[in-house]
Amino acid sequence: MDSSRARQQLRRRFLLLPDAEAQLDREGDAGPETSTAVEKKEKPLPRLNIHSGFWILASIVVTYYVDFFKTLKENFHTSSWFLCGSALLLVSLSIAFYCIVYLEWYCGIGEYDVKYPALIPITTASFIAAGICFNIALWHVWSFFTPLLLFTQFMGVVMFITLLG
């Protein structure tokens, strides 16, 4: 492989700066330079797309047709699993809003997962544990439909949060 082709591949892979290329030239790899187009950053996908709109709409439909809030109101004080799931969901949503509102919007830290690597796993674990607790608490109401209904609700919440940040 000739040096100019190797340099192009290296530039594409690691996006070398021009001064790094000058150091490569000083090491004895002098050859004809070929011009390469600067890679453009890809546009991020829009936050509200068909996929997120579907989950939010499905969550609203499930909430309406299965009397979700009425069922939650009736089972609020009868099950400790429901209270535990509510606390875990509150922890998960609090961390998510802390990341989105405070770290990203207020402090301007776009890469908060790099600066605070423990936040994402803690949020994910508490969200999954909340889902398990809600499944146990509401199993007697909807039986084997409970995981499907709660998954639809959780996906609606997740897609709604992604609209914010």
UniProtKB/Swiss-Prot annotation:
A GO term from the CC aspect: membrane
InterPro entries (UniProt xref): TMEM128 (IPR033579)
Membrane topology recorded in Swiss-Prot or TrEMBL: Multi-pass membrane protein
Species of provenance: Homo sapiens
Coiled coil (UniProt feature): none
Primary site of residence: membrane
Residue stretches spanning the membrane: 49-69, 81-101, 119-139, 144-164
Pfam families: TMEM128
Keywords (A to Z) from UniProt: Membrane, Transmembrane, Transmembrane helix
Protein name: Transmembrane protein 128
Places the protein is found: Membrane
